[in-house]
A protein has these predicted regions:
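Short "lid" loop at the C-terminus of a central beta-strand within the Rossmann-like core
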Residues: 20-21, 136-140, 168-170
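Hydrophobic adenine-recognition pocket in adenosine-nucleotide-binding enzymes
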Residues: 104-110
Length: 172
């Protein structure tokens, strides 16, 4: 895993693009922690025992267990603590080059101006930081679907490296 390979060792802060929640069962979360050899603190995730029903849990608690304590999330909702409309260039220049890790877990396919959305994502990320992108290849619920060549091309055009790339297939 990227965690076991030390990729997040220096990661102190994160920005989730879009408000994110854990959408896995308690058993799946426990298994994921075993894979990374991180102690699973059951009390922090007990709400997941009711998944998919019950209260949802912010990803903030997952990142904290990985040692990333400065959690931030943005949303287009004007009530959001960090309002960012990814369709347009970043207005708040103090956010540029601020985050060690910026995630797109099913957010940027909802933005019409895809090029600007990923440019903003890049600008939010610190030098030598990470952009973690997890997108549906087909179906999904946004305006766009991407394939690997989109992300490989984006990386090549901007002199970035792809650390890990894969397709995940859900069978259940």
């Amino acid at each position: 895993s990227l965690y076991n390979n030390g990729k997040f060792k220096k990661t102190k802060n994160i920005l989730d693009l879009g408000t994110k929640e854990l959408r896995v069962s308690f058993d799946q979360m426990e298994y994921a922690f075993k894979q990374t050899k991180i102690k699973f603190k059951k009390q922090n995730f007990k709400t997941l025992k009711k998944f998919p029903k019950g209260k949802r849990i912010s990803t903030k608690f997952f990142w904290k267990e990985l040692g990333i304590s400065d959690y931030n999330c943005s949303d287009i909702n004007k009530k959001s603590k960090m309002y960012i409309d990814l369709n347009f260039p970043l207005k708040n220049k103090s956010l540029m080059n601020k985050f060690d890790l910026v995630t797109d877990f099913g957010n940027n396919e909802h933005v019409f101006n895809v090029g600007q959305a990923y440019k903003n994502m890049y600008q939010l990320c610190k030098k030598n930081g990470y952009m973690w992108i997890f997108q549906a290849v087909y179906g999904g619920n946004g305006f766009f679907n991407y394939d690997m060549s989109f992300f490989e091309g984006m990386a090549a055009a901007n002199n970035l490296s792809v650390l890990y790339s894969c397709y995940l297939v859900q069978t259940s």
